[in-house]
Amino acid sequence: MDFDDHDDGDEEMPPMPVSSSYETPPQHGLAGGGMAPKPPGEIGSHVKGPSCGGGRYRECLKNHAVGIGGHAVDGCGEFMAAGEEGTIDALRCAACNCHRNFHRKESESLAGEGSPFSPAAVVPYGATPHHQFSPYYRTPAGYLHHHQHHMAAAAAAAAAAAGGHPQRPLALPSTSHSGRDDGDDLSGMVGPMSAVGPLSGMSLGAGPSGSGSGKKRFRTKFTQEQKDKMLAFAERVGWRIQKHDEAAVQQFCDEVGVKRHVLKVWMHNNKHTLGKKLP
């Protein structure tokens, strides 16, 4: 008696899978041969009874997260009939309480016959099956992973391989250049100057390679007369250029022959050295 086509009032038959990945074409000419396992995405839903077709039913493939658009299985590894053969309970798994059709069927077929599934559905040995209808999949160990993370990692690895060379590291300021001229506008960066604000690192750099271009920057050279005049002017304005001193600063720059920003940098660099030497 065939029990797959009848429904019991006390037993609610679970809905048949709607995904095309659960369907498998019927097999013809089954005979006792080598065991040919099917991909995890296909089950023998066409079998009409416990004695039809033979074979064993392996892990349960029922998607318990279809309501939220995901994919999660219960971890049942093999179908175990809940009743004796010939009863309605024989089609229900005693471990996961799912219908037998949700379990992957491992049928017996001849190796020379045509494969009942397409070559694209074959999962290589050791590879984890990725279900196309859901961004989530579960590894054989039972842990839920997000498929997009692995896709992004694979895309990054492919881009790195296609590039042929790794990304160049950022150029760091050179620390080997220590022979500065005491007479230029970038001198005086010694002693207490290492503890001042970020203006020196932002506007002055750290040497010829501080900008990363490798080109040596132009440095202004001062005569001793210019240094003396700038020192006297800096003491007069208090080593700081304020708004009410703009006219005097511009007049001094025209007389000495230096630019305003050069004078400002020189005052900043020598404020903690020459300014503290005075009584």
Swiss-Prot record:
GO terms for molecular function: DNA-binding transcription factor activity; transcription cis-regulatory region binding; zinc ion binding. Residues 1-13 have a biased composition (Acidic residues). It comes from the Eukaryota. GO terms for biological process: regulation of developmental process. GO terms for cellular component: nucleus. The record marks M267 as: Required for DNA-binding. Residues 215-278 bind DNA. The keyword Hydrolase does not apply. Putative transcription factor. Homo- and heterodimer with other ZFHD proteins. This is Zinc-finger homeodomain protein 1. It comes from Oryza sativa subsp. indica (Rice). The lineage of its organism: Eukaryota, Viridiplantae, Streptophyta, Embryophyta, Tracheophyta.
